[in-house]
């Protein structure tokens, strides 16, 4: 059960085009390069550090309690009459492809704008974003697991910082591009 909910909840980085500009050629735009989000998250964010404990069905109040206590959560949820709070939200969070059921849904570029009903597996991080972006008449948590959160081991975080510094130093050295690209 836990393995399957973890598999269902898994999603990679949230990369998506603004639904208002997808497929359009936009001139005179700017961008910037983040040197790397992954080392930052590995060093500065907390992760589940104990085995997940099965809680079972829970109320939204229970979930919010666990979240306030800094617990890592994974759960199966059902949402009724789901809709975006802001119809102009450029990148809605819920991907239809990650739902186990999605009934009478309005989909734009693969993302759920509204649905009569949907089921999906989510983490506490997903749920925070969903609660911020969407309204629903009812949210039912049919199954939930929790783990204590904490930082990854100090030695590992220090190693990540060391490699990050070495990588960024290569970036500015002429003739080292091949080594930088490998890192």
Please describe what each predicted stretch is:
Residues 1-183:
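Conserved acidic
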């Amino acid at each position: 059960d836990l393995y399957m909910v973890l598999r269902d909840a898994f999603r990679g980085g949230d990369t998506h085009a603004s639904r208002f500009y997808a497929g359009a050629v936009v001139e005179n735009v700017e961008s910037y390069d983040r040197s790397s989000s992954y080392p930052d998250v590995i060093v500065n964010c907390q992760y589940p550090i104990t085995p997940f404990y099965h809680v079972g069905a829970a109320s939204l109040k229970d979930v919010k309690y666990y979240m306030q206590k800094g617990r890592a959560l994974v759960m199966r949820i059902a949402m009724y009459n789901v809709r975006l709070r802001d119809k102009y939200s450029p990148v809605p969070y819920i991907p239809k492809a990650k739902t186990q059921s999605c009934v009478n849904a309005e989909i734009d570029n693969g993302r759920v704008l509204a649905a009569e009903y949907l089921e999906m597996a989510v983490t506490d991080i997903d749920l925070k974003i969903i609660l911020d972006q969407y309204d629903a008449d009812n949210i039912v948590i049919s199954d939930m697991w929790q783990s204590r959160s904490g930082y990854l081991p100090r030695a590992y975080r220090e190693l990540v910082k060391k490699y990050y510094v070495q990588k960024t130093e290569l970036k500015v050295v002429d003739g080292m591009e091949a080594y930088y690209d490998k890192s």
